[in-house]
Every structure is written in structure tokens, then in C-alpha cells.
């Protein structure tokens, strides 16, 4: 009997010890930051919150480290992005605030859900190359921020005028569509009403009359760009906003997940089975497995999150893109804020089934272009030719293996040299 009591006491002590978190010292956290950044450059601690410290290094790069040794050390990092900690980047601030809430709670020991190497690549490099934002030139066709009596000016490219910001939803849509370079033309029509003190103004877009100039959209607009390059991206952002029935005002541009889905399907010819799924329906392994599956297939993920301040009755929505992951299961996020604070983040720990905070999350699944063209029409010009062969070879040499359904000439679910030979054989046989 005494032995049994002794065993129970020992087990209870072991369980209690495993539940009690130790605290990482500043030196330990700095070492963890240097390891993940693969750098010995001096680190500046720019902020400390209960459970986590934020470090950045000169010349770019940052790491957010957990001080709770029940948690994996690295919560987020980037080897090149800047850490501004301003209020300007709403998506990053959502993640930071949600993570702070989690770290305030007593946590059981946890390990990050990593990609299963028998099913997924160890890591996926960021799929997006764009570092777009919501201000100039992206907003130069959005509604004016003050009333303009000449209604013909609305929806035109006017760099010298004041405009409402694009909004994170339309901007995320634009970056997502630019990845696929699809569509060339839109479908249908849509109108939205903008409210001013002087009266309402309704803006209208006929998407079928629009041509999206993908070749003139560049990755980075923070340097010099031509008028044509500015117009190309401004039109896309404006059309995304109207298609998603965005409400534009001094706070920016707001829309809903359902409207974004409907915009993709009804106006941009994306798969009509596309839908969004809330995280609350999934546990951590299932949620992360969905993410690894989509990314390893070459498809970025449009992600949605909300800050819900119940006492104040305020709901702030955010949209951004997850476009890669590392070997430790942290996902790469493009926040849509000019590349600022883009990096790898632990979103697995934001598990609404385990923690009691009011931050809603969802991701869009099945959101792919409806490519209704010939397999092999890689350049999307409506015919097959030697240009498609060279484009396909360039596509493969760039290290791509997915993300362009038309490049999958032999329809085997992957893109490889066999697609090149199949296309050449097809052309040599006299087919076009």
C-alpha cells in the first residue's frame, strides 16, 4: 500500500513538473534567434511581452522567440524582412496579438506539427515573388477619398488625386491572381456604392471588357515604375475591390470571405467548388496537413483572420497569403504590406480548439483557375506553338513543378520533361 502511494506521489510530481514551464534567459533566446537566422550579427531586443521576446538585426532579419520552454523556441523569423512594429501592417499585428494571448496562458508542453516527409517535401520555398501593398500605385483607381463631382473620373488612373486604400481583401486577391496570371479577361458586371457627405457615388465595372496586363505587373513597386506598370496593377486591385463588393471609407476597404469567394467564381473564372473553411472545425494536425498539402502542390493559400473585440463591438478582418513552409512547420506569410514583416510564422499554436481567445481564422480551399484551354498552351494565347515549348522549358528551369495546369501536357498531375516531349511530338505531328 505504501509502495502504491509512493508511486502515485512520484507520478503526480512528474506530471506537475512537466506542466510547469521554465523560463528561457535572454542569452538563451538570443542564441535561438542567431541559430534560426544563421547569423552572428548583433541582435537588438525591440520588444518583450510576457512569454515572448522580439529581436531584429541591422540590415534586415528578425526573430520572435518564446521565453516559455514548454513551447518551441522560435515563434517567427525572417532572414531579410524588416520588423517595424508599427500599426500599419494589420495582418502581422493580428498574428502578434493572437500569439501574445496564447503565450499568456499556461501551456502544456507542445511540439510544432511538422510536415510528414513520407507525404510532403521537407520545405516549400515562398511561391509568391510580389511585395505589393495597399497604397500607391495600387490604389490609384480606387474611389477618391474626398467627393469629386466629375463622376467620369471615378475608376480612372489618377496618381495626383487622393484615393482610399485598396483594402487587405482585394490586395490579397490581386497577389493571388498575379501568381496564376489568370484570368486574361473577367466575367460579368458589378457595382458598388461609395458614401460621401455630398452624396453617394456608384462605381461600375464591366469585367468582360477588361484585359489584365500581367506582363506589365512587376514584383516591387517601391522603386521606379512606368505608367503602364502602375496602371496594370491599379486596375487589377480596383477590379478585385469592386468584384468583392468592397466598402471603401477612411478606414480602408472592407469586404467578407463570402464576397471574395463569389468574386473569384463569378467574375474571375475560378473553380466554382472553391470555399472557405473555419479553423474551429479542425485540430492542429489536420489543419496543418491541409496547409502542407496545398503548398506542396504549388498552390498558395488565401487566409482570413479576424480580431474580435467583444466589449467594444469591433470586428477587424484581415486577409493575407500563406505561400510556403520550412522544415520545422512554420509557414511563410506574405502580409501584403510591401514585404515588411514577411517571414515564417507559427500559426499551429493559434489553435482555437485549445485556447480561449476570440480570433477567428479560415482558409480558402479549391481556389484554382478554370483553365479552359488546350493542355500545352503555356503562354495562354489560344494556340499551340514553339513559344509554348520554350515557355515550358523556362518554367521547368526556374524550378517549378506545379501551379500551371496548362503546362501539364500529358495530364499526369505533375509538370516534368515528359510534358516537353509530349508537346514537341504533338507539334511535329502537324497539330496546332
What are these regions (language model features)?
Residues 1-8:
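Bacterial N-terminal signal peptides that target proteins for export
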Residues 9, 19-20:
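Cleavable N-terminal signal peptides
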Residues 22-48, 63, 70-136, 142-143, ...:
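Cys-His-centered catalytic/binding microenvironment captured across papain-like cysteine peptidases
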Residues 35-39, 68, 171-183, 266-267, ...:
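Structured segments of extracytoplasmic/periplasmic soluble domains
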Residues 43-61, 262, 266-334:
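Active-site-adjacent substructure of cysteine-protease-like catalytic cores
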Residues 74-253:
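Active-site-adjacent structural segments surrounding the nucleophilic cysteine of cysteine proteases
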Residues 370-432:
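Cellulosome-associated attachment modules in secreted, modular CAZymes
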Amino acid at each position: 500500500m505504501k509502495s502504491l502511494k509512493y508511486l502515485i506521489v512520484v507520478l503526480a510530481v512528474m506530471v506537475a513538473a512537466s506542466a510547469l514551464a521554465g523560463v528561457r534567459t535572454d542569452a538563451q533566446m538570443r542564441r535561438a534567434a542567431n541559430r534560426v537566422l544563421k547569423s552572428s550579427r548583433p541582435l537588438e531586443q525591440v520588444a518583450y511581452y510576457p512569454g515572448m521576446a522580439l529581436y531584429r538585426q541591422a540590415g534586415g532579419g528578425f526573430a520572435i522567440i518564446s521565453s516559455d520552454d514548454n513551447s518551441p523556441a522560435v515563434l517567427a523569423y525572417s532572414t531579410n524582412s524588416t520588423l517595424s512594429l508599427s500599426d500599419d501592417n494589420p495582418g502581422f499585428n493580428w498574428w502578434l496579438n493572437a500569439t501574445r494571448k496564447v503565450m499568456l496562458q499556461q501551456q502544456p508542453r507542445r511540439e510544432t506539427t511538422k510536415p510528414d516527409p513520407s507525404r510532403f517535401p521537407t520545405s516549400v520555398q515562398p511561391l509568391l515573388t510580389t511585395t505589393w501593398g495597399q497604397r500607391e500605385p495600387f490604389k490609384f483607381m480606387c474611389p477618391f477619398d474626398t467627393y469629386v463631382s466629375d463622376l467620369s473620373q471615378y475608376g480612372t488612373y489618377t496618381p495626383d488625386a487622393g484615393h482610399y486604400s485598396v483594402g487587405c481583401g482585394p490586395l490579397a486577391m490581386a497577389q493571388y491572381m498575379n501568381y496564376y496570371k489568370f484570368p486574361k479577361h473577367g466575367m460579368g458586371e458589378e457595382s458598388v456604392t461609395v458614401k460621401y457627405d455630398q452624396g453617394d457615388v456608384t462605381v461600375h465595372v464591366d469585367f468582360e471588357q477588361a484585359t489584365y496586363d500581367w506582363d506589365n505587373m512587376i514584383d516591387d513597386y517601391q522603386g521606379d515604375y512606368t505608367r503602364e506598370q502602375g496602371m496594370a496593377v491599379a486596375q487589377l486591385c480596383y477590379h478585385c475591390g469592386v468584384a468583392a463588393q468592397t466598402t471603401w471609407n477612411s478606414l480602408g476597404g472592407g469586404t467578407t470571405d463570402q464576397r471574395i469567394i463569389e468574386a473569384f467564381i463569378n467574375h474571375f473564372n475560378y473553380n466554382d467548388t472553391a470555399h472557405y473553411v473555419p479553423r474551429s472545425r479542425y485540430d492542429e494536425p489536420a489543419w496543418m496537413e491541409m496547409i502542407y498539402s496545398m503548398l506542396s502542390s504549388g498552390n498558395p493559400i488565401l487566409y482570413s483572420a479576424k480580431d474580435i473585440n467583444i466589449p467594444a463591438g469591433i470586428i477587424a478582418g484581415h486577409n493575407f497569403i500563406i505561400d510556403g513552409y520550412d522544415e520545422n512547420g512554420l509557414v511563410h506569410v506574405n502580409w501584403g504590406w510591401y514585404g515588411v514583416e514577411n517571414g515564417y510564422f507559427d500559426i499551429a499554436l493559434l489553435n482555437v480548439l485549445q485556447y480561449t481567445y476570440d480570433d477567428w481564422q479560415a482558409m480558402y480551399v479549391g481556389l484554382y483557375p478554370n483553365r479552359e484551354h488546350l493542355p500545352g498552351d503555356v503562354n495562354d494565347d489560344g494556340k499551340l506553338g514553339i513559344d509554348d515549348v520554350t515557355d515550358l522549358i523556362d518554367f521547368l528551369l526556374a524550378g517549378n513543378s506545379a501551379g500551371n495546369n496548362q503546362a501539364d501536357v500529358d495530364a499526369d498531375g505533375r509538370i516534368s520533361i515528359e510534358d516537353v516531349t509530349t508537346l514537341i511530338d504533338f507539334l511535329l505531328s502537324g497539330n496546332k
